[in-house]
Amino acid sequence: MSAKVLVSRISCAFIRGVQRAGVIATAKHFPGHYATEHDPAIALATVHGPLELLDDNLQVFRQVIGAGVQAVMPGPAVFPAIDPDQSASTSAKVIALLRDTLGFDGLIISDDLDAVSILRGNTLNDTAVASLAAGAHLLLVSSESGLDAIAEAIVSAVDEGTLERQVLLAASSKVRAVAKSRQSEPLIK
């Protein structure tokens, strides 16, 4: 049995079990990290090589999407074959691959916006806005410091036209819909 088949089977079984128990499962890190040079939390990380090297990873993501995973988290690394300028969590191109090519219509959660590889020299506020603009619905920030400033930056970005109001409304609607779907389903006893 190939590694991708084994990973798919285990991942799908885990997702089904977790979601049957009333928890929203999240598949990560899209589009896969078959090789990174550095730890993305503390250094800039890039996954080099042609898009074909991601085929096995993308097949696993197709399987977990087919199994009904409710959320996917784009990773912190840059994938030059898809988008040479943005980390996966702030890349509209990576998120388009997830949505358009793989047909994922669920919740997209950014990876930790405090990660050096996601920040890429930008402020946390700008990175949060970039992630939403790229198509994330929910932002992960590992510390509570600066949450008010992030919220203010998002409001300012909408006011200034940097972030479309409709994008923010769609993100909040998606988060509420997924949360509501979990509340309406009974938990396994």
How should these model regions be labeled?
Residues A3-S156, E160-Q166:
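Second-shell residues forming the walls of enzyme active-site clefts
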Residues S156-L187:
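Mid-to-C-terminal alpha-helical segments outside catalytic/metal-binding sites
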Residues M1-L6, F14, S181-K189:
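Proteins with a high burden of low-complexity, intrinsically disordered sequence enriched in S/T/G/P/A and R
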